[in-house]
Structures are given as C-alpha cells and as structure tokens.
C-alpha cells in the first residue's frame, strides 16, 4: 500500500500537470475543463483574505488565476488587535462565499492541494508553516514571511529539506509601475532607486515588517541582491533607510506615518530618471501566486526574500545604534545561528 504522503504528492503533481497542459482553457476552468487546484487559507484575519478569495473564485477568472480555487479556510488568529478584532468578520465573509471553514490546520491540509498562509501576525508564521511544509503542500506566505529573520531562514530551510515550493512577497513588487521600470530600456540600467510608502508598526516584530515591507520589497525588485549595509534615521512621523549596495549603488526607502503617504518609486538610470506610482491591485500578485502553484516555480528567490528581511532587521539595529551603518553580513550571521539552533531542536 502506498504511503498517504506519497499519494498526496502524486495527486498534487497530477493536478499541476493537468492544469499546465490545459492552460489555454483555464479561463473557463470554473465552468468546465480541468479541475482547479484546491487552495486552503490559513489565518482569516486580514483584508487580503476576502480580496484574494474574490479574485481566485471569480467565475470569469482567466489564465493562472483560474487554475486555483479557494475551497477551505482555517480562521486562526492571535491576541494582536489587528487579528482578534477582524478574524470573525473575515471568516464569515468567506463562509458567505461558500468556502468551508475548518477548525484546525491538519484537517485543512487533508482537503487542499496548496496553501496561502495569510495570518496578519507574522510571529506565528513559522509554527503555521511547519505542518504545511511537512505535508508537502506548495506554500505562499503573505507578508511578512515571518516574525523574525531567523524564523524566515528556518521556513526556507525546511521547505528546501522537504522539497516544497515556497515563496513570499508584497503585492507592490508586481504592480504595473514597478514592472514597467524593470523593463524600461531607456533608463540605461538602474544605478540607484528610491521608494516610499506608509510605514505603521506592529508590536512584537521589527518596525518595517508590518507595512514598511510594501516599500522595501519594490526597492529590492529594482536594485536586486547585494545590499551590504544599512543606515536609518527615525523621527516621530518618518523613517528614512539608506542601503549601500556593492559597486557603490545606493537605494533608499522613506516610510511615512503622517501626511500624504502614497506608494511610489524612482529609478535612477544611466540615461534617464523615471518615477512611478503604485498602480493596479491584488490581481497581479494573485496571478503570480496562481502561476507559482501551477508550475512550482517561485517568482522571488528565497535568497532575495531573506536579504530583504536582513535589510529590515539591520534598519532596526541601526536605530538602536543611533543611526550607525549596520552590516547585513553581521545581521545574517546572527540570524543563521539562531535559525540553526531552532532547526536542531
């Protein structure tokens, strides 16, 4: 008799291949054709939950979005006000959409092929991700990937050990404005970049993890890997974080807690300087998530996400040191030691 985990893995593979082979007719997948991948949501305490569910479960969905359907959800929740004040409301919204509400993660994993970990409180992402990874379910983790850099490293290492596709990203990375900057040949290459956006904090996690990530993620999309050190200035209303990349490139993020706080970015090129604002909505991210579940290929490398979170933790360390430059290598070394201890347990 085959092992249940092996059987589950074969079923997932068959579904993904089937959906890939019929990608051209995925636009009508909810009405006819191959069955979409059954997706489960963990943590129904963020506005992303009903927003994503409406996108994936839209009968008129096309392409990669149509290859996924939200079929079950586990409410979860923590003592964080942003969680316990909203989990009931969003759970009922999903129930009203015909999505099954399940009272435990193990039970949810029995009913789904892939998982979106949505819990607004990043501190519990590691404990919620572990059973998903051990069950072999491809996993998208909404921002922040974890409550600490060490936990993020553990999640990606476990996913690697268990050969489970896993990725995390802010939706702003995939907004049309950022993507157009990346494709803009008239820039003459990106020599530097500046991004900005709202930056409220969440108790218990590094300052930038909760909302600053939405401005820092596109900064890394534009600059790429290779940040070596971070310097931070903090006032009551503003954060300003400057990163020094290898080859002398500079990327900056301005976090705004008062006054006008739209998202935006500027790319400084060899030939032109081009500015963009935040355009689009969650559909771009959902399309990437759908493609990820269909193909098993992440649009954001684990190494980049880990460096983004090292950047944010280095920003906190710079604040503690009065704005002194902080090496990402040192922050990463400390976090890897903590992650190693957790993995050894």
Report residues per predicted region.
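Rossmann-like dinucleotide-binding domain that binds NAD(P)(H)
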Residues: 193-260, 303-310
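N-terminal glycine-/serine-/threonine-rich beta1-alpha1-beta2 phosphate-ribose binding loop
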Residues: 14, 22, 31-135, 157-161, ...
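Bacterial N-terminal signal peptides that target proteins for export
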Residues: 1-18
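C-terminal helix-rich "cap/oligomerization" subdomain common to oxidoreductases
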Residues: 32-33, 115-116, 294-345
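Short helix/strand-capping hinge loops at secondary-structure junctions
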Residues: 136-138, 143-144
């Amino acid at each position: 008799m085959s092992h249940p985990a092996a059987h589950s893995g074969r079923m997932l593979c068959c579904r993904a291949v089937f959906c890939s082979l019929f990608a051209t007719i995925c636009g009508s997948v909810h009405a006819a054709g191959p069955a979409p991948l059954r997706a489960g949501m963990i943590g129904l305490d963020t506005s992303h939950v009903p927003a994503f569910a409406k996108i994936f479960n839209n009968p008129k969905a096309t392409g990669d979005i149509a290859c996924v359907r939200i079929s079950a959800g586990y409410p979860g929740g923590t003592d964080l006000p942003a969680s316990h004040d909203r989990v009931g409301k969003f759970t009922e919204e999903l129930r009203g959409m015909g999505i099954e509400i399940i009272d435990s993660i193990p039970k949810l994993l029995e009913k789904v092929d892939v998982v979106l970990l949505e819990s607004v409180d990043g501190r519990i992402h590691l404990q919620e991700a572990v059973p998903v990874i051990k069950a072999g379910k491809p996993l998208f983790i909404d921002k922040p990937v974890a409550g600490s850099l060490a936990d993020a490293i553990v999640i990606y290492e476990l996913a690697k050990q268990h050969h489970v596709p896993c990725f995390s990203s802010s939706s702003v990375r995939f907004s049309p404005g950022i993507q157009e900057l990346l494709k803009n040949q008239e820039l003459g290459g990106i020599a530097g970049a500046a991004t900005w956006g709202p930056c409220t904090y969440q108790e218990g996690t590094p300052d930038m993890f909760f909302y600053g990530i939405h401005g820092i993620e596109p900064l890394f999309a534009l600059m790429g890997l290779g940040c070596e050190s971070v310097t931070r200035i903090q006032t009551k209303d503003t954060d300003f974080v400057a990163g020094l990349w290898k080859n002398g490139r500079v990327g900056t993020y301005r976090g705004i807690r008062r006054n006008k706080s739209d998202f935006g970015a500027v790319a400084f090129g060899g030939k032109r300087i081009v500015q963009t604002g935040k355009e689009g909505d969650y559909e771009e991210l959902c399309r990437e998530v759908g493609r990820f579940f269909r193909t098993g290929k992440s649009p954001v490398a684990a190494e980049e996400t880990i460096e983004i979170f090292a950047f944010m933790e280095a920003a906190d360390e710079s604040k503690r040191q009065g704005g002194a430059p902080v090496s990402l290598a040192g922050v990463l070394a400390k976090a890897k030691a903590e992650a190693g201890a957790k993995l050894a347990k």
